[in-house]
């Protein structure tokens, strides 16, 4: 148990699988100080992937269902496999269960890479399984509880730009 918990998810189970697999098949816990990213992974080569983040307040992931729906939408928009929401929900809970820091509001992040680059020899030998990282961190920058001031601004392009220029991926982070 720790104040920083890092798990590598089973991409085959968490993306494209059906139902919830046994806990041992969902995530593998690793030392957060150890290097774990494969140099041939598209997240390292091109930043190719999707992510979500939320606060876990006193053991409860805030709006997790909405964050996982948005993760699914992001996956669809970039032609990645569909996430297995029940399995991801369980995997998140397994990570939370390993957390034991007194900080009540650590940051939870789910990072999903497209997997190994198929244009490399290593990637050609592997299947196109997403790489999934889930971590909880009480030692990083946490959400402020202070009130904020917001302003509404234009993004500098028309609201219908997505229909005319879908390659912009406008709305991937709704």
Language model features with spans:
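Helix-start/capping segments and mature chain N-termini
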Residues: 1-86, 90-94, 113, 121-174
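Ordered, amphipathic secondary-structure segments that act as subunit-interaction surfaces
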Residues: 92, 97, 101-112
């Amino acid at each position: 148990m720790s104040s920083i918990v890092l798990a590598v998810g089973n991409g085959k189970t968490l993306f494209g699988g059906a139902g919830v697999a046994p806990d041992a098949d969902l995530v593998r816990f690793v030392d957060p100080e150890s290097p774990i990213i494969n140099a041939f992974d598209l997240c390292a080569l091109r930043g190719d992937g999707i992510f979500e983040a939320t606060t876990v307040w006193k053991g409860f992931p805030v709006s997790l269902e909405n964050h996982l729906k948005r993760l699914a939408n992001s996956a669809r928009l970039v032609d990645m496999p569909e996430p297995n929401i029940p399995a991801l929900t369980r995997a998140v809970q397994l990570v939370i269960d390993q957390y034991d820091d007194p900080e009540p509001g650590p940051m939870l992040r789910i990072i999903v890479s497209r997997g190994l680059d198929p244009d490399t020899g290593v990637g050609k030998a592997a299947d196109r399984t997403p790489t999934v990282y889930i971590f909880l961190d009480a030692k990083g920058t946490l959400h402020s509880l202070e009130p904020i001031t917001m302003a509404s601004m234009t993004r500098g392009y028309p609201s219908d730009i997505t229909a005319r220029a879908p390659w912009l991926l406008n709305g991937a982070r709704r």
